[in-house]
């Protein structure tokens, strides 16, 4: 399938892409957390930031910028530490909100839509693991001798975005269901926010020790 456009082993790529999307990451937890805290509409807004960020990284990978980052330790470390600091800030902010929240106080602040979009976009763009993925994974399924390697790259990128959209939709709708359940269970909501905050801190620690 799509071999005429320079795509190699598309079905193998499709299966691999599904499993990769299903692996939890910072973007996954941010979208889930947003869906739980702010509802479906803002959950999709968070997902939109992820989609835009992924599209930018895929374009940079195709343009060769991602390879430059991968092979230049200084650039890789800059992206890596920026991402780790941002994840640590997000996790710390969530934990602080839980610790300072008073009983009976609502934990769902009216966070502006623009802030949610910026956060999810920043999470995507400061993830060097995604950069390494697009360089190392995509290249295995593109015939470099094809007349239209750009079309092949676009097909692979679009496939990944569609799979990601389906998975993010599941997370957002699940988060909306969870919201209705925990509205009257404040201790459970606090526990959930604490766990997600700790997950972000854990991702920050792992990202800080990532090697190119």
Swiss-Prot record:
What family does the entry list?
A: Belongs to the Rht family.
Subcellular location, record wording: Cell inner membrane
Its transmembrane ranges are 5-25, 49-69, 81-101, 122-142, 153-173, 188-208
Any idea what job this protein has? Exporter of leucine.
Q: Which domain of life is it from?
A: Bacteria
Select a single GO molecular function from the record's annotations and give it. L-leucine transmembrane transporter activity
| Bilayer topology | Multi-pass membrane protein
In its UniProt entry, the species of origin is given as Klebsiella pneumoniae subsp. pneumoniae (strain ATCC 700721 / MGH 78578)
- What's a GO biological-process term for it? L-leucine transport
Which keywords has UniProt assigned to this entry? Amino-acid transport, Antiport, Cell inner membrane, Cell membrane, Membrane, Transmembrane, Transmembrane helix, Transport
Q: What is this protein called?
A: Leucine efflux protein
């Amino acid at each position: 399938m799509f071999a005429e456009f320079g795509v190699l082993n598309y079905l193998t790529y499709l299966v691999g892409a599904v499993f990769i999307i299903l692996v939890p990451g910072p973007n996954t937890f941010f979208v889930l957390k947003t869906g739980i805290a702010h509802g479906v509409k803002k959950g999709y807004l968070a997902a939109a930031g992820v989609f835009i960020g992924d599209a930018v990284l895929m374009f940079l990978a195709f343009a060769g910028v991602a390879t430059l980052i991968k092979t230049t330790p200084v650039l890789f470390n800059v992206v890596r530490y920026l991402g780790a600091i941002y994840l640590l800030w997000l996790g710390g902010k969530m934990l602080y909100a839980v610790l300072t929240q008073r009983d009976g106080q609502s934990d769902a602040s009216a966070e502006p839509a623009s802030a949610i979009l910026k956060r999810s976009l920043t999470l995507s763009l400061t993830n060097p693991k995604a950069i390494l993925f697009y360089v190392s994974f995509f290249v295995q399924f593109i015939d470099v001798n094809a007349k239209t390697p750009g079309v092949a790259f676009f097909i692979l990128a679009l496939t990944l975005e569609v799979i990601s959209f389906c998975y993010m939709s599941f997370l957002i709708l699940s988060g909306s269901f969870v919201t209705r359940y925990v509205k009257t269970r404040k201790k459970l909501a606090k526990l959930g926010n604490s766990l997600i905050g700790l997950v972000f801190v854990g991702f920050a620690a792992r990202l800080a020790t990532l090697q190119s």
